[in-house]
């Protein structure tokens, strides 16, 4: 992955779509929009992209249609997203995600959800992601 390459993933509310664009010059110019809804099998609201290492990205957000908190793993720097993981669901409110790397090297993903409470009274929830880079696991 080139140092100036940027991947941007957005939801288009009007078109009921999720798309990505690429920049190869640090954000000065951008590629044409590419629809990734078929790859994700959902409209991903509030997509949150986290680079875990040079080639691996975690994409998380809300699957609008299924009312789920989901994440996907890309092992090719955002070209393909698969390995869908359903973290939680919600009744009427929830699912916006955020991810941070901990000092242990693990990643903490947090979201809110009313799956186990009254509707519209969400709890804050979290999970740890244990990710081992390929360079760490091969030696």
What is each model feature region?
Residues 1-139:
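Asp-box/BNR beta-propeller blade signature and adjacent active/binding-site loops
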């Amino acid at each position: 992955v080139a140092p100036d390459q940027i991947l941007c993933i957005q939801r288009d509310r009007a078109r009921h779509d999720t798309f990505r664009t690429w920049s190869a010059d640090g954000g000065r110019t951008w590629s044409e929009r590419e629809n990734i809804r078929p790859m994700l099998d959902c409209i991903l609201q509030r997509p949150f992209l986290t680079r875990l290492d040079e080639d691996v990205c975690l994409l998380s957000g809300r699957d609008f249609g299924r009312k789920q908190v989901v994440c996907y793993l890309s092992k090719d720097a955002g070209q393909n997203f698969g390995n869908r993981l359903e973290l939680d669901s919600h009744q009427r409110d929830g699912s916006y995600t955020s991810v941070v790397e901990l000092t242990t090297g693990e990643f903490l993903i947090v979201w809110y959800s009313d799956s186990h409470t009254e509707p519209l009274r969400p709890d804050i929830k979290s999970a740890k992601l244990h990710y081992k880079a390929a360079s760490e696991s091969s030696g």
